Amino acid sequence: MQLRQASVLPRLSPTNAECRPGELLHIIGPNGAGKSTLLARAAGLLAGEGEVYLAGTPLSQYTAADLAVRRAYLAQQQPPLALMPVFQYWQRHQPPLAQEYAVEKVVHFLAERLMLTDKLARPLTQLSGGEWQRVRLVAALLQIWPTINPHARLLLLDEPTNSLDVAQQVALDSLLSELCRLGIAVVVCAHDLNHSAHHADRVWLLSAGVLVAQGETEDVMLPEVLSPVFGVAFQRHVVDGRNWIITRSA
């Protein structure tokens, strides 16, 4: 995916950036920085100036159906309005023309990994917040899982760990790593700086709608880069060989 002067004024200034196949990229920044706007623009869901390219083709040249085959998008919030059961909701997200037995295999795999195997018949409106978040994650993953969708290229997730407990976050991290190994680019709007420091391959840092830094994680997740943007004095500590970003004591 490439962004070429892509903007949604005044929320997102013209932006040039790219995410490579098989890369896990995190978008970070303070609240109101434009992270969700950038993700929705990259998904083709917000109009604006400039262009977003996917697999070398401008999003504007894809039909809605063609785009849905190539990328999946998880919004930060989405109420479960339908009365349908979980398995039917997932059916609506499976790739067209996929072999039914192959889809069933992936559904079982994803449901097991995200601890939902006992929820398939439950109506969406009877799910807890964490269950609904995991159901939505399975739907997004199912839409672009490469073994059943050879056209898949990109997964866009806005705050995917909302309402997840620690074990569920670990399970999601493992699935995203596996998806990247299969060649899918994954872009995540994130709020936990240490999680980004430990898991992202590359990071985009936004401030007031401007992409102020982008690059390898170790080059962006530095106190001197983060502190001016967040307005907090950060320092870096190394514990058991891992870098941790913490606030400086008063």
UniProtKB/Swiss-Prot annotation:
UniProt topology in membrane: Peripheral membrane protein
InterPro entries from the UniProt entry: AAA+_ATPase, ABC_transporter-like_ATP-bd, ABC_transporter-like_CS, ABC_transptr_BtuD, P-loop_NTPase
GO molecular function: ABC-type vitamin B12 transporter activity; ATP binding; ATP hydrolysis activity
Binding positions (ATP): 29-36
Entry's localization field: Cell inner membrane
ATP-binding found in the keyword field: yes
Residues covered by the ABC transporter domain: 3-233
GO CC annotation terms, alphabetical: plasma membrane
Reactions the enzyme catalyzes: an R-cob(III)alamin(out) + ATP + H2O = an R-cob(III)alamin(in) + ADP + phosphate + H(+)
EC number: 7.6.2.8
Lineage top rank: taxon: Bacteria
Flavoprotein as UniProt keyword: no
Main location group: membrane
Gene3D superfamilies associated with the record: P-loop containing nucleotide triphosphate hydrolases
CDD domains assigned to the protein according to its UniProt record, in alphabetical order: ABC_Iron-Siderophores_B12_Hemin
Keyword annotations from UniProtKB, A to Z: ATP-binding, Cell inner membrane, Cell membrane, Membrane, Nucleotide-binding, Translocase, Transport
Role: Part of the ABC transporter complex BtuCDF involved in vitamin B12 import. Responsible for energy coupling to the transport system.
Subunit structure: The complex is composed of two ATP-binding proteins (BtuD), two transmembrane proteins (BtuC) and a solute-binding protein (BtuF).
Family, similarity comment: Belongs to the ABC transporter superfamily. Vitamin B12 importer (TC 3.A.1.13.1) family.
Protein name stated in the entry: Vitamin B12 import ATP-binding protein BtuD
Record organism: Pectobacterium atrosepticum (strain SCRI 1043 / ATCC BAA-672) (Erwinia carotovora subsp. atroseptica)
Species lineage: Bacteria, Pseudomonadati, Pseudomonadota, Gammaproteobacteria, Enterobacterales
UniProt gene name: btuD
